[in-house]
């Protein structure tokens, strides 16, 4: 067999040179394959990392699907703030007198929620999150647990009995309506014939109506809501006002429906969400004292002035021997990456934030202003002797519930909403406002002199 020139050339070379020459040839043959292999391995690593990151994202932001309750329970035990078998004194027991209801944490409770939205006809479609597409139910399973005492389990029949022949009135903005609808559902859960709970003027619940009065027929009691987002009167400006003044807030005059609240047995105020630039000056709403429009008055000063008017009205117009007065503090919003107008979102939030408070600085400013007004009113006007005003200080507890908002699911059958127009201000029902009403229930029972040998899970006249 004849040899080719390459073989003859190899035989004429020393063995070491032959090895080197053949190695070089081998390298040339495999170089493209090694490049392809390297590219393949790098690509595989990238794909794996994407799957890993996506898994972490899903684990943090999506609803968790557990095979059974025990698996879910074990997972929840790992969460910060989750506590099991924490035996505490009952709030309504004698030894629970010094307990602060608002110093506590959110704990998982499989017995919640207290009602289902599909069973309650009183809920605005904007709060029916689960019925209109929200995929998770975790937000309905959290109960507020004070650190040093247990709240009484909400008993709708007991509260209705205590409300017999009485009026319970909510006055405030749409977050107040949120809480009012929550209490209607909580109480109606004890009524088998829902036709015996009705609006006395046959008005359907809508955010455009000024007030609603719902009667529980068998108990001759009413649970009412009056829309008054500023609590003081918003009206036409005085003659001769600048053209840009469309309306004014009369800081020395209560809302026109105030006469309807005066004789309530329980009166629950709230305000705050409308005391901002968007809801006032941007829309041509300025502040008025007497007949003078204060064009340069800051919103914070106007808010303080209005709250003093509210405190003065409570002192002078409310019968302290009959009426319990509560003031619920500001419930924070949880927009991320913007606000209502600029594309803020909250739809990825499915668990409470057990860490640091998310309360923004402007919210604390509202709280500080209210605290200052209450403190000065108590000090200078002897209001403590005439009105037993209690503060439902829900700001810190609500700040942790970034998971509780309607987000995309507030448009009913027309939803979900556009991604850039989410609702991270109001609350899904059932949900966070139920806990505010459980606090109201506990303080109401305390006032009524009710005591129980054992509670489910504190009374404070001011901020702690």
Swiss-Prot record:
Record keywords, A-Z: Membrane, Signal-anchor, Transmembrane, Transmembrane helix
GO molecular function: O-acetyltransferase activity
Gene Ontology CC annotations of this record: membrane
Cellular localisation: Membrane
Locus of motif DCXHWCLPGXXDXWN motif: 423-437
Transmembrane region(s): 33-53
Location of the motif GDS motif: 172-174
Membrane topology value: Single-pass type II membrane protein
Main localization category: membrane
Family membership noted in the UniProt record: Belongs to the PC-esterase family. TBL subfamily.
General function of this protein: May act as a bridging protein that binds pectin and other cell wall polysaccharides. Probably involved in maintaining esterification of pectins. May be involved in the specific O-acetylation of cell wall polymers.
Note: Contains 2 motifs that are conserved in esterases, but it is unlikely that this protein belongs to the catalytically active pectin esterases.
Protein name: Protein trichome birefringence-like 11
The species this protein was found in: Arabidopsis thaliana (Mouse-ear cress)
Gene: TBL11
């Amino acid at each position: 067999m004849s040899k080719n020139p390459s073989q003859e050339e190899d035989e004429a070379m020393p063995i070491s040179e032959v090895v080197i020459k053949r190695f070089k040839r081998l390298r040339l043959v495999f170089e493209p394959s090694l490049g392809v292999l390297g590219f393949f391995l790098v690509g595989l690593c990238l794909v794996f990392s994407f799957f890993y990151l996506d898994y972490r994202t899903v684990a943090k932001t999506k609803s968790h699907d557990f095979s059974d309750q025990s698996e879910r329970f074990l997972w929840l035990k790992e969460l910060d703030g989750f506590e099991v078998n924490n035996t505490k004194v009952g709030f309504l027991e004698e030894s629970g007198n010094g307990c602060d209801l608002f110093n506590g944490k959110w704990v998982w409770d499989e017995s919640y929620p207290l009602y289902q939205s599909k069973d309650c006809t009183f809920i605005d479609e904007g709060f029916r999150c689960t019925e209109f597409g929200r995929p998770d139910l975790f937000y309905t399973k959290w109960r507020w647990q004070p650190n040093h005492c247990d709240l009484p389990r909400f008993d709708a029949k007991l509260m209705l009995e205590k409300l017999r022949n009485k009026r319970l009135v909510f006055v405030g903005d749409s977050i107040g309506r949120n809480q009012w609808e929550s209490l209607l559902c909580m109480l109606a859960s004890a009524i088998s014939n829902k036709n015996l709970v009705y609006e006395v003027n046959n008005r359907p619940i809508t955010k455009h109506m000024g007030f609603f009065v719902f009667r529980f027929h068998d108990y001759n009691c009413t649970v009412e809501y009056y829309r008054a987002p500023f609590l003081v009167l918003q009206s036409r400006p005085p003659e001769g006002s600048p053209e840009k003044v469309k309306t004014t807030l009369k800081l020395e005059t209560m809302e026109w429906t105030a006469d309807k609240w005066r004789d309530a047995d329980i009166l629950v105020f709230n305000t705050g969400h409308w005391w901002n630039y968007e809801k006032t000056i941007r829309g041509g709403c300025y502040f008025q004292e007497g007949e003078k429009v204060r064009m340069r008055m800051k919103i914070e000063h106007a808010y303080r002035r209005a709250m003093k008017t509210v405190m003065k009205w409570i002192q002078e117009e409310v019968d302290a021997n009959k009426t319990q007065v509560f003031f619920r503090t500001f419930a924070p919003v949880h927009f991320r990456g913007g606000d209502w107008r600029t594309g803020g979102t909250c739809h990825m939030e499915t668990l409470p934030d057990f860490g640091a408070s998310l309360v923004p600085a402007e919210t604390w400013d509202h709280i500080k202003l209210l605290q200052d007004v209450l403190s000065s009113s108590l000090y200078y006007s002897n209001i403590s002797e005439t009105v037993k005003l209690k503060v439902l200080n829900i700001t810190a507890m609500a700040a942790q519930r970034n998971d509780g908002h309607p987000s995309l699911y507030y448009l009913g059958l027309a939803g979900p909403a556009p991604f850039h127009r989410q609702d991270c201000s109001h609350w899904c029902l059932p949900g966070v406002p139920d806990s505010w009403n459980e606090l109201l229930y506990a303080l109401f029972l305390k006032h009524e002199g009710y005591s129980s040998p054992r509670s489910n899970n504190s009374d404070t006249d001011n901020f702690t």
